[in-house]
């Protein structure tokens, strides 16, 4: 059977139809049809080129008009630079920084003056339709040792290959797309993945998205476009959910992180619920700003940014980072985010998340340049300066005076329901009277939890345990009444214990005797006896080995 009439091609055609008819991407079939040269359809000179140079120059000149050709050429050369000493993930990180933040170039302007570090933007993130979206099928790429590979679909934006899609027929395991194709392509044509933002795998029934560093189990489904949607695992849902032009650019610009906390670069892409939840929280801020300017809500109402309830284990700390970094990137004004926790381990864990992805420096608590408050005095000093991020325990608010009237401070309270009713929480609000508050929690609020609602407002995003289990992010916990049961083998045990107590406690007064009887009556020594614990351990091992 030829490729044109294969089952793989049928699902590929379905996917490309979605790109063209529903998403408005340009599409092209390159299989046995591509020419080469400046005047060719894609403008490639040979199969080794993975950046579409012709489109790249068209868009970068459009977005950065009036510059000498040397400036555009330098931008292209910088984006094409290669390194033989860096890993694929490190190269991908460097390319991402250039593509997202712009490419710095030096040139002589029309007045003959030297211009240094002029940043040329590659994408128009504010108006998606100003960009060139092109999905190309079956494009031959030549890589190591002149070996060639032909990916199913490559998605180019302004000539940059940001999207890689590998498709399989419905009867084939999706994991094969990862093991047999994706990993092979990374090895043979790594240059394609220098620029890659997203990897999509699908067999028409299962569909997953991941990054170039992700293992297969870290690829996740994209089942919803809005939080209210019922989750559907389908090819059209993941393509529409991820590749709609505005969502695609938003996901690229604001929902990619690179974590270097373990000594090697790991690329992280927001999961479906994080993308939806963070955007809902940010839309709520924008909505309240508009209402406040129109005089429809009070300042107190504007300061209540809502409760972000995403169940434990759903990546809440990373959601905080996405939330903060999108506001820093898209909002005007120098915001300070104050992350407040009530436990040392949470404080350390959240700071570790922020520092691991480069949002804050990796410095020890107590160091001169630390952004973690080590005392109430240190906290006052930190709040007196304009930092992007600060971290503290609620207990450091051991003072009552006002520190600043700044209205561009957002307090992020982790496990918001636990510590909002006491004196320390009151001190926090007195110190920052114009701050806004958002609560992050992994625990649902009780209906009568009026204190938390009074401070933060209602839910702004909800991702509960059941939905997390359905999405494969959490494992259900079942209780099976099994194991080592307690039973009475000696019917006269009570009389024997009484006899021992009577024989050994003649010199005890009534209170001491009562205390001895209470100790013998406790279940703990029986429940934790070595013989019983050994039996429980053996049963647990048997259960997990045979389930």
Where are these regions (language model features)?
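ATP-dependent helicase/translocase motor core
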Residues: 2-336, 345, 349-361, 386-389, ...
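Conserved helicase ATPase motor motifs in RecA-like P-loop NTPase domains
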Residues: 311-312, 417-418, 431-448, 472
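Residues immediately C-terminal
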Residues: 346, 396, 415-419, 445-446
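Conserved motor-coupling elements within RecA-like helicase/translocase cores
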Residues: 372-390, 402-406
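SF2 helicase catalytic motif II
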Residues: 404-438
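Interdomain helical connector at the RecA1-RecA2 junction of SF1/SF2 helicase-like NTPases
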Residues: 450-547
């Amino acid at each position: 059977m030829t490729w044109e009439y294969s089952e793989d091609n049928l699902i590929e055609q379905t996917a490309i139809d979605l790109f063209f008819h529903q998403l408005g991407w340009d599409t092209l079939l390159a299989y046995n049809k591509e020419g080469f040269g400046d005047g060719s359809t894609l403008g490639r000179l040979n199969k080794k080129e993975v950046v579409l140079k012709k489109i790249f120059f068209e868009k970068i000149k459009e977005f950065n008009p009036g510059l000498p050709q040397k400036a555009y050429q330098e931008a292209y050369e910088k984006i094409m630079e290669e390194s033989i000493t860096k890993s694929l993930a490190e190269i991908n990180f460097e390319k991402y920084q250039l593509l997202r933040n712009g490419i710095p170039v030096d040139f002589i302007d029309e007045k003959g003056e030297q211009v240094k570090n002029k940043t040329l933007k590659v994408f128009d993130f504010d108006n998606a339709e100003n960009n060139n979206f092109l999905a190309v099928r079956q494009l031959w790429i030549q890589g190591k040792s002149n070996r060639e590979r032909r990916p199913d679909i490559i998605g180019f934006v302004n000539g940059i290959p940001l999207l890689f899609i590998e498709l399989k027929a419905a009867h084939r395991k999706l994991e094969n797309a990862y093991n047999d194709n994706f990993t092979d392509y990374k090895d043979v044509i790594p240059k394609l993945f220098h620029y890659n933002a997203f990897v999509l795998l699908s067999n028409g029934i299962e569909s997953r998205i991941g990054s170039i560093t992700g293992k297969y189990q870290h690829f996740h489904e994209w089942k919803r476009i809005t939080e209210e949607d019922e989750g559907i695992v389908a090819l059209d849902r993941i393509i529409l959910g991820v590749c709609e032009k505005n969502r695609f650019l938003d996901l690229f610009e604001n929902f990619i992180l690179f974590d270097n906390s373990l000594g090697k670069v790991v690329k992280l892409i927001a999961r479906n619920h994080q993308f939806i939840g963070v955007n809902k929280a940010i839309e709520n801020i924008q909505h309240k700003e508009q209402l406040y300017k129109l005089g429809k809500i009070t300042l107190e109402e504007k300061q209540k940014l809502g409760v972000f309830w995403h169940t434990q284990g759903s990546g809440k700390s990373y959601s905080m980072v996405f939330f903060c970094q999108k506001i820093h990137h898209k909002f005007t004004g120098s915001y300070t985010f104050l992350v407040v926790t009530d436990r040392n381990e949470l404080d350390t864990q959240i700071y570790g998340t922020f520092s691991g992805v480069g949002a804050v420096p990796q410095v020890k608590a107590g160091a001169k340049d630390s952004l973690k408050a080590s005392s109430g005095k240190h906290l006052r000093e930190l709040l007196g300066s304009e930092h992007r991020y600060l971290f503290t325990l609620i207990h450091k608010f051991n003072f009552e005076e006002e520190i600043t009237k700044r209205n561009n401070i957002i307090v992020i309270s982790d496990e918001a329901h636990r510590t909002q009713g006491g004196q320390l929480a009151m001190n926090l609000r007195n110190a920052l009277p114009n701050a806004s508050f958002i609560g992050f929690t992994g625990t649902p609020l009780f209906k009568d939890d009026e204190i938390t609602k009074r401070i933060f407002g209602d839910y702004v995003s909800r991702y509960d345990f059941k939905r997390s289990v359905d999405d494969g992010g959490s494992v259900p916990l079942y209780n099976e009444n099994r194991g080592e049961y307690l039973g009475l083998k000696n019917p006269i045990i009570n009389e024997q214990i009484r006899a021992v107590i009577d024989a050994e406690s003649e010199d005890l007064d009534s209170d001491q005797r009562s205390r001895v009887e209470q100790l013998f009556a406790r279940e703990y020594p029986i429940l934790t006896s070595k013989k019983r614990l050994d039996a429980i351990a053996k049963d647990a091992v048997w259960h997990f080995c045979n389930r």
